[in-house]
A protein has these predicted regions:
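Bacterial Sec-dependent N-terminal signal peptides
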Residues: 1-12
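Mature extracellular/secreted ectodomains of secretory-pathway proteins
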Residues: 80, 89-133, 137-140
Length: 182
């Protein structure tokens, strides 16, 4: 999983991107190794769209937030911060899917926990899909990859600012739920 990096660290852009990609691959491997029934409830939060946005009319929505994806050193230790989140929801024929990866702050302050990767795969009302990947470092955009070969409505591509805003919102939801449930 991703090692904490102090703010202002002088890593090159290529090394930062490689670190993020490696961390994302590590998170995916850990999730594949654990089937949902076996995944410890204390290390995972599941929230439905009705709980997130009561009365909003969003259907079939679910957010999964995972803690402690790097259990190599202290398997019994529960991570205090979210590491990875994915959520889906549908509004009519429109489908939304997001993934977010964070790293832990060096100083243990949750306000300093930054997203490093944001992925979206959204399907518009014409059943056309667009994929978007943003890589961040210390809150700054490193790289953007957008695949819109199906020519989906561009409104379905979140901006980097929207991606960071969503990541912040989900981080707050995750940490509040973690506090309430412990």
């Amino acid at each position: 999983m991703l090692l904490p990096v102090a703010a202002g660290a002088q890593n090159s852009r290529e090394k930062q991107l490689a670190t993020i990609r490696e961390s994302y691959a590590g998170a995916m491997n850990m999730l594949q190794m654990r089937s949902d029934p076996e995944y410890p409830a204390k290390d995972k939060i599941v929230i439905t769209s009705d709980e997130m946005w009561p009365g909003s009319g969003q259907h079939n929505g679910k957010m999964e937030i995972f803690f402690g994806l790097d259990l190599s050193e202290e398997e019994s230790e529960i991570q205090r911060f979210p590491r990875f989140a994915r959520y889906t929801y549908n509004i009519g024929s429109q489908k939304y899917y997001y993934e977010i990866l964070w790293y832990d702050p060096d100083d243990g302050n949750p306000e300093h926990c930054q997203p490093v990767f944001f992925f979206s795969k959204n399907t518009d009302y014409h059943d056309k899909t667009v994929e978007c990947r943003y890589y961040f470092w210390d809150g700054k955009l490193l790289k953007t990859l957008i695949n819109n070969t199906q020519q989906a409505d561009e409104d379905y591509i979140p901006s980097p600012e929207e991606a960071l805003s969503r990541a912040k919102m989900i981080f707050q939801i995750a940490t509040m739920n973690k506090l309430w449930n412990n």
